[in-house]
Amino acid sequence: MVIPDIKTILYPTDLSRHGKKVFSYSEVIAAALGAQIVVLHVVEPLSKQASAVIDGILPSGIDDTGTMHRKGVEALKETIEEEVRGYCIELLGDSSKFDALIKAVEVIDGLCAQVILDRAGKHDADLIVMGTHGHSAFSDMLLGSVAHKVVHRASVPVTLVPFKS
Protein backbone atom coordinates (compact mmCIF):
# COMPACT_ATOMS: atom_id res chain seq x y z
CA MET A 1 0.00 0.00 0.00
CA VAL A 2 1.27 3.46 -0.92
CA ILE A 3 1.18 6.00 1.89
CA PRO A 4 -0.08 9.37 0.68
CA ASP A 5 2.44 12.21 0.70
CA ILE A 6 0.80 14.97 2.74
CA LYS A 7 2.76 18.22 2.55
CA THR A 8 0.06 20.87 2.98
CA ILE A 9 -2.92 20.88 5.35
CA LEU A 10 -5.67 23.48 5.03
CA TYR A 11 -7.11 24.51 8.40
CA PRO A 12 -10.20 26.73 8.06
CA THR A 13 -11.09 28.43 11.35
CA ASP A 14 -13.84 30.61 12.77
CA LEU A 15 -11.49 31.54 15.66
CA SER A 16 -13.82 29.97 18.23
CA ARG A 17 -12.79 27.91 21.28
CA HIS A 18 -13.66 24.80 19.28
CA GLY A 19 -11.28 26.02 16.58
CA LYS A 20 -8.41 25.62 19.03
CA LYS A 21 -9.23 21.92 19.38
CA VAL A 22 -9.33 21.57 15.60
CA PHE A 23 -6.00 23.40 15.31
CA SER A 24 -4.41 20.96 17.75
CA TYR A 25 -5.41 18.08 15.44
CA SER A 26 -3.97 19.96 12.46
CA GLU A 27 -0.75 20.56 14.37
CA VAL A 28 -0.35 16.92 15.44
CA ILE A 29 -1.00 15.63 11.92
CA ALA A 30 1.37 18.20 10.37
CA ALA A 31 4.14 17.44 12.89
CA ALA A 32 3.80 13.68 12.37
CA LEU A 33 3.92 13.98 8.58
CA GLY A 34 6.35 16.86 8.20
CA ALA A 35 3.60 18.95 6.60
CA GLN A 36 2.80 22.64 6.82
CA ILE A 37 -0.52 24.30 7.61
CA VAL A 38 -2.40 26.98 5.70
CA VAL A 39 -4.65 28.81 8.18
CA LEU A 40 -7.81 30.25 6.61
CA HIS A 41 -10.48 32.53 8.07
CA VAL A 42 -13.48 33.34 5.86
CA VAL A 43 -15.51 36.53 6.23
CA GLU A 44 -18.98 35.84 4.85
CA PRO A 45 -20.95 38.52 2.99
CA LEU A 46 -24.08 40.02 4.54
CA SER A 47 -27.31 38.25 3.65
CA LYS A 48 -29.68 39.97 1.21
CA GLN A 49 -32.15 40.48 4.04
CA ALA A 50 -29.58 42.12 6.32
CA SER A 51 -28.35 44.33 3.47
CA ALA A 52 -31.91 45.41 2.64
CA VAL A 53 -32.66 46.31 6.26
CA ILE A 54 -29.44 48.29 6.65
CA ASP A 55 -29.85 50.01 3.26
CA GLY A 56 -33.36 51.05 4.34
CA ILE A 57 -32.00 52.70 7.47
CA LEU A 58 -29.02 54.50 5.91
CA PRO A 59 -29.52 58.08 4.76
CA SER A 60 -29.10 58.78 1.05
CA GLY A 61 -25.62 59.66 -0.14
CA ILE A 62 -23.96 56.99 2.03
CA ASP A 63 -22.38 53.91 0.44
CA ASP A 64 -24.66 50.89 0.14
CA THR A 65 -24.06 47.95 2.48
CA GLY A 66 -22.17 45.97 -0.17
CA THR A 67 -19.64 48.77 -0.60
CA MET A 68 -19.45 49.35 3.15
CA HIS A 69 -18.94 45.61 3.73
CA ARG A 70 -16.10 45.44 1.17
CA LYS A 71 -14.40 48.50 2.67
CA GLY A 72 -14.83 47.08 6.17
CA VAL A 73 -13.44 43.67 5.20
CA GLU A 74 -10.43 45.24 3.50
CA ALA A 75 -9.77 47.44 6.54
CA LEU A 76 -10.12 44.49 8.91
CA LYS A 77 -8.13 41.90 6.92
CA GLU A 78 -4.77 42.99 8.27
CA THR A 79 -6.10 43.14 11.83
CA ILE A 80 -7.75 39.73 11.50
CA GLU A 81 -4.58 38.22 9.97
CA GLU A 82 -2.59 39.47 12.97
CA GLU A 83 -5.26 38.06 15.31
CA VAL A 84 -5.05 34.67 13.54
CA ARG A 85 -1.24 34.74 13.83
CA GLY A 86 -1.48 35.55 17.53
CA TYR A 87 -4.07 32.80 18.00
CA CYS A 88 -1.76 30.24 16.35
CA ILE A 89 1.34 31.39 18.22
CA GLU A 90 -0.61 31.15 21.49
CA LEU A 91 -1.60 27.57 20.67
CA LEU A 92 1.88 26.57 19.49
CA GLY A 93 3.68 28.14 22.43
CA ASP A 94 6.21 30.26 20.53
CA SER A 95 6.78 32.08 17.27
CA SER A 96 9.60 29.81 16.03
CA LYS A 97 7.14 26.90 15.87
CA PHE A 98 4.73 29.18 14.01
CA ASP A 99 7.36 30.06 11.39
CA ALA A 100 8.24 26.39 10.84
CA LEU A 101 4.70 24.99 10.81
CA ILE A 102 2.52 27.68 9.23
CA LYS A 103 2.85 28.06 5.46
CA ALA A 104 0.34 30.92 5.14
CA VAL A 105 -2.39 32.80 6.99
CA GLU A 106 -5.27 34.06 4.87
CA VAL A 107 -8.42 36.07 5.49
CA ILE A 108 -10.74 35.82 2.48
CA ASP A 109 -14.13 37.39 1.82
CA GLY A 110 -16.74 35.00 0.39
CA LEU A 111 -18.97 32.00 0.97
CA CYS A 112 -17.28 29.63 3.44
CA ALA A 113 -17.50 26.30 1.64
CA GLN A 114 -16.57 27.75 -1.75
CA VAL A 115 -13.62 29.71 -0.35
CA ILE A 116 -12.34 26.63 1.52
CA LEU A 117 -12.48 24.54 -1.66
CA ASP A 118 -10.88 27.30 -3.76
CA ARG A 119 -8.02 27.85 -1.30
CA ALA A 120 -7.42 24.10 -0.97
CA GLY A 121 -6.88 24.04 -4.73
CA LYS A 122 -4.74 27.19 -4.79
CA HIS A 123 -2.40 25.84 -2.10
CA ASP A 124 -2.39 22.27 -3.46
CA ALA A 125 -3.63 21.10 -0.07
CA ASP A 126 -3.37 17.36 0.47
CA LEU A 127 -5.77 17.36 3.45
CA ILE A 128 -8.40 19.65 4.96
CA VAL A 129 -8.83 19.53 8.75
CA MET A 130 -11.92 21.37 9.96
CA GLY A 131 -14.50 21.41 12.70
CA THR A 132 -18.16 20.59 12.59
CA HIS A 133 -20.71 22.06 14.93
CA GLY A 134 -22.42 18.71 15.43
CA HIS A 135 -25.77 19.55 13.89
CA SER A 136 -28.12 16.64 13.37
CA ALA A 137 -28.33 14.88 10.01
CA PHE A 138 -31.86 16.29 9.68
CA SER A 139 -30.73 19.90 10.11
CA ASP A 140 -27.82 19.33 7.72
CA MET A 141 -30.29 17.99 5.16
CA LEU A 142 -32.53 21.05 5.56
CA LEU A 143 -30.00 23.80 6.10
CA GLY A 144 -26.78 22.40 4.74
CA SER A 145 -23.50 23.01 6.52
CA VAL A 146 -20.07 24.18 5.53
CA ALA A 147 -18.49 20.88 6.61
CA HIS A 148 -21.08 18.85 4.70
CA LYS A 149 -20.52 20.87 1.51
CA VAL A 150 -16.74 20.65 1.80
CA VAL A 151 -16.75 16.88 2.43
CA HIS A 152 -18.94 16.22 -0.60
CA ARG A 153 -17.15 18.61 -2.99
CA ALA A 154 -13.50 18.34 -1.96
CA SER A 155 -11.02 16.60 -4.21
CA VAL A 156 -8.78 15.79 -1.21
CA PRO A 157 -9.50 13.98 2.07
CA VAL A 158 -11.27 15.96 4.78
CA THR A 159 -10.85 15.24 8.49
CA LEU A 160 -13.74 16.51 10.61
CA VAL A 161 -13.32 17.25 14.31
CA PRO A 162 -16.75 17.20 15.99
CA PHE A 163 -17.87 19.84 18.43
CA LYS A 164 -19.09 18.41 21.71
CA SER A 165 -20.84 20.89 23.97
Question: What spans do the regions from the language model cover?
Answer:
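Short glycine/proline- and acidic residue-enriched helix-loop micro-motifs
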Residues: 63-78, 102
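Gly/Ser-rich helix-loop-strand patches that form or flank binding pockets
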Residues: 114, 118-165
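Structural beta-alpha unit
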Residues: 1-4, 46, 78, 82, ...
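Small/aliphatic-rich secondary-structure junction motif
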Residues: 2-66
